[in-house]
Amino acid sequence: MATATVLEKANIGVYTNTNHDLWVAESKPTLEEVKSGESLKPGEVTVQVRSTGICGSDVHFWHAGCIGPMIVTGDHILGHESAGEVIAVASDVTHLKPGDRVAVEPNIPCHACEPCLTGRYNGCEKVLFLSTPPVDGLLRRYVNHPAVWCHKIGDMSYEDGALLEPLSVSLAAIERSGLRLGDPVLVTGAGPIGLITLLSARAAGATPIVITDIDEGRLAFAKSLVPDVITYKVQTNLSAEDNAAGIIDAFNDGQGSAPDALKPKLALECTGVESSVASAIWSVKFGGKVFVIGVGKNEMKIPFMRLSTQEIDLQYQYRYCNTWPRAIRLVRNGVISLKKLVTHRFLLEDALKAFETAADPKTGAIKVQIMSNEEDVKGASA
């Protein structure tokens, strides 16, 4: 076991529970365990987590206590979008050393089942995915994690390193959806995943791109990220089919009813909302595809006959696999820039304020990140 410099701050984490409380309290491993290395298992490293993004799923676990069958049953630590510094390594770890900057891929698959052995470890039924109950998450000052799932990020900022997790979600969608250069693409939802998917689709050569949302502010933010994106504000008083007509108009400068009107070949659905999925289905061309990234309710109504008579493929994804090295290259080489996405930053001790900001649409927050050190907050904001 090798360690970095002596640390003084106690380990604390951000918890929720079945009563939907949210609080900060002491966490494992303890500072004493970090200093001694006694909590490290073979193959693990200790990471001082420097930056963690708040995901919509974190807010949902706090407010609702569950996502589908994943249920909070006791005191539970949130967070799975993290980057930090390696401060200790087990004796059998040779490719990482104290001082290395890493992004933490928050899953621990079994490495023995068919999905794992065929390279699709996101399908591992025994996977331990950090922040998904009952597995505690990364919103802690220190965490032990298998070294194989800690990816070196070089001089990349910890902010960008934490954003590699949602970027991985969008990269999985881009790859599995079959997006090609020049494809007209619809992105539904201008939240963090939708915005990162917009950046990814543009980098992959999609053109033109229309992005939708119910919030004018988020559409304006999308325009600031990708100036040539076309925006469409979803009208909540209209049917999914009528909103689709407006979307097709947006692709065609208001001439969506013309015989030769362009329709998207691919819709990347980033909300999981029933009406948005339906609008995407009504929008795409004959033989097109609706690829659902967003997580929605257990059951929803969709226009089945539209799918059938238009030969529209409806496809889904579950997390990601084998995306992190590519995500790192894309960010480090400037192909995708994530720098504008973090709009609010808070210290770990102020996690309640951070979550309240992330959960309140009135704040205009895009991505809220929680940082372990005051200098990280000040440095990132500068």
Swiss-Prot record:
Pfam families found in the cross-reference section: ADH_N, ADH_zinc_N
Pathway(s) it belongs to: Carbohydrate degradation; L-arabinose degradation via L-arabinitol; D-xylulose 5-phosphate from L-arabinose (fungal route): step 2/5
GO molecular function per UniProt: L-arabinitol 4-dehydrogenase activity; L-iditol 2-dehydrogenase (NAD+) activity; nucleotide binding; oxidoreductase activity; zinc ion binding
Residues the record lists as binding Zn(2+) 1: 55, 80-81, 165
List of residues binding NAD(+): 192-193, 213, 218, 293, 317-319
Keywords recorded for this protein, A-Z: Arabinose catabolism, Carbohydrate metabolism, Metal-binding, NAD, Nucleotide-binding, Oxidoreductase, Zinc
Required cofactor(s): Zn(2+)
Binding site for Zn(2+) 2: 110, 113, 116, 124
InterPro entries: ADH-like_C, ADH-like_N, ADH_Zn_CS, GroES-like_sf, NAD(P)-bd_dom_sf, SDH-like
Disulphide-bridged cysteine pairs: none
Reactions performed catalytically: L-arabinitol + NAD(+) = L-xylulose + NADH + H(+)
Note describing how the cofactor binds: Binds 2 Zn(2+) ions per subunit.
Range of residues in the leader sequence: none
Gene Ontology BP, a term: L-xylitol catabolic process to xylulose 5-phosphate
Record-listed E.C. numbers: 1.1.1.12
Enzyme class, UniProt record, top EC level: oxidoreductase
UniProt keyword annotation of Nucleotide-binding present: yes
Family: Belongs to the zinc-containing alcohol dehydrogenase family.
Subunit structure comment from the entry: Homotetramer.
Function, as annotated: Catalyzes the NAD-dependent oxidation of L-arabinitol to L-xylulose in the fungal L-arabinose catabolic pathway. L-arabinose catabolism is important for using plant material as a carbon source. Also active on ribitol and xylitol. Not active with NADP as cosubstrate.
Protein name listed in UniProt: L-arabinitol 4-dehydrogenase
Gene label: ladA
